[in-house]
Amino acid sequence: LERADALAEYGMQFGMAFQLVDDLLDLVSTDALMGKPVNNDAKSGVYTYPVLIALAEDADPDGFKALMLGAKDSQQAADELKARVLASSAVTQTLDRIGEYNKLASACLSDLPDSPTRTGLMELPERYLNGILTEKSDPAHRTW
């Protein structure tokens, strides 16, 4: 049961990192790179971790909230919201949080016996993060 618990916790931590990467890609990728529309979270009324970080930092939180609400119906509001998120420290803070989840995921495996599977699982979070962000992010938005 300890092994199952460790793997379940690994999955939880890696899943959190995976979701944050997805949240970032919605902001730092392009339709062409992703093969689907980006900046969709804001248009769908989904307020992701990077958006909430930017809201907390914004000099005009009421204006920022108005953009959050307006993004559902206005491409201009969605674009301005994205620009304000990208101008904040949200990308850097989200990358830091992803790194924390990746470390937690790998730590969950530390008591498992050494094996190629364990090694692969320990490398997976960081390899996924670096690979997908390099492959799918717009170089114009890479600030890391």
Across the structure, where does each feature detected by a protein language model lie?
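All-alpha prenyltransferase/terpene-synthase fold signal
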Residues: 1-144
